[in-house]
């Protein structure tokens, strides 16, 4: 069975999202489910070029294929100023559509220090 891909939804080095993604991965492994972590800090710089939308960089194809092959996605979404990180939006925009999401379960986990616990950050990408 293909693994569930856990996305640490920020490119901030040593982020809380990356730590939470690792905890989620451990939980899947304890239950006998294959799971891998991909941190947006690993995104190749070439995907931020304006031409990357029209012609996907070769370094991106491997990342995109991991998403397409995954059994599901589990996205850790940190709250940035009442929303989700722009880099997470860019990550989603760069993926093949609809193949990356079609008939695939997607779970969101919010991460924030505030009293609302990333409520808005998690609601927005669900829409």
Question: Where are each of the predicted segments found?
Answer:
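Short, conserved loop/helix-junction motifs that constitute active-site signature segments
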Residues: 98-102
């Amino acid at each position: 069975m293909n693994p569930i891909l856990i996305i640490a939804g920020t490119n901030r080095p040593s982020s809380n999202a990356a730590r939470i993604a690792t905890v989620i991965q451990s939980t899947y492994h304890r239950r006998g489910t294959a799971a891998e972590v991909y941190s947006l800090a690993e995104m190749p710089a070439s995907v931020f070029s304006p031409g990357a939308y029209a012609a996907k960089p070769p370094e991106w194809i491997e990342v995109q294929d991991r998403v397409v092959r995954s059994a599901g996605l589990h996205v850790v979404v940190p709250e940035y100023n009442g929303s989700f990180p722009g880099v997470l939006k860019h990550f989603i925009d760069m993926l093949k559509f609809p193949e990356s999401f079609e008939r695939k379960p997607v779970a969101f986990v919010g991460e924030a220090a505030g009293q609302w616990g990333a409520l808005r950050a998690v609601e927005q990408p669900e829409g």
